[in-house]
From Swiss-Prot:
Protein name (record): Adenosine 5'-phosphosulfate reductase
Gene name of the encoded protein: cysH
Active-site residues per Swiss-Prot or TrEMBL entry: C234
Reaction equation(s) it catalyzes: [thioredoxin]-disulfide + sulfite + AMP + 2 H(+) = adenosine 5'-phosphosulfate + [thioredoxin]-dithiol
UniProt KW keywords: Cytoplasm, Iron, Iron-sulfur, Metal-binding, Oxidoreductase
Cofactor: [4Fe-4S] cluster
An example Gene Ontology molecular-function term: adenylyl-sulfate reductase (thioredoxin) activity
Alphabetized CDD domains for the sequence: PAPS_reductase
Length: 240
């Protein structure tokens, strides 16, 4: 796999669109090697520290030991998520893990937009606390890495390894597109990786506390997010 440059301005299509990997990581390791060859340390991994995140952090650590990883701290995450981040810092001390917060504190957001904005206008809340901070974090970065998998949802089913990201005017690299939910957990268990203990208590997908619900059937890896609403994405992976 050649390390030739793919940028937002010259992107035509995923150069590996017709590649069907048959290695033990379903192509993830080779895509990460390509990404770090092309973009070096300028590429950023935006990690939510979910199950897919544990897989990617481990794979990235084997490819680029001083990689930059950004966590969008909305100030609304579960304590278990914050605890996991500290565990990851200990396990992978050479990785550069950055905590990115919104411009507004929760108190300032309430004063400006009203209390519990996530209930009344969840899209606006996601923009303030997740999308805008990631825009800032990716400013000047030619590419970023995401843990999207095709199996996760209809809206993610067409994701390629290398994508033109209209939202952030960047290249989005998605090494796990061919992974299933079972693949993710098999890798975690086989490699004895740390993970968020909420996964063992009915939380397949873990985000902010107000927008994450416990579910009885955890076979759907996106179940429990924005329950009772039509919302299925925070907006990081949509173009508008």
């Amino acid at each position: 796999m050649g390390g030739y440059s793919v940028t937002y301005s010259n992107f035509v299509k995923d150069p590996y669109k017709d590649w069907f990997p048959d290695d033990e990581t379903n192509g993830a390791s080779k895509i990460l090697q390509w990404a770090y060859e092309v973009y070096g340390t300028d590429i950023v991994y935006a990690c939510s520290f979910g199950a897919e995140g544990m897989v990617l952090i481990d794979l990235i650590s084997k490819t680029q030991k001083n990689a930059d990883i950004v966590f969008l701290d909305t100030d609304l995450h579960f304590q278990e998520t914050y605890d996991l981040i500290e565990d990851i810092k200990v396990k992978y001390p050479t990785l550069n893990i950055h905590i990115k917060k919104p411009d507004l504190t929760l108190e300032e957001q309430a004063a400006e937009h009203g209390s519990a904005l996530w209930k009344r206008q969840p899209d606006q809340c996601c923009y303030i606390r997740k999308i805008k901070p990631l825009e800032d974090a990716l400013s000047g970065a030619p590419a970023w890495i995401s843990g999207l998998r095709r199996e996760q949802s209809v809206s993610r089913s067409k994701t390629d390894f290398i994508n033109k990201d209209e939202r952030f005017k960047s290249i989005k690299v998605c090494p796990l597109i061919h992974w299933t939910w079972d693949d993710v957990w098999e890798y975690i268990k086989d490699n004895n990786l740390p993970y968020n203990e909420l996964h063992d208590n009915g939380y397949p997908s873990i985000g902010c506390i107000p927008c994450t619900s416990q579910v009885s059937d955890s076979s759907d890896s996106r179940a429990g997010r924005w329950a009772g609403t039509q919302k299925t994405e925070c907006g990081l992976h949509t173009s508008d």
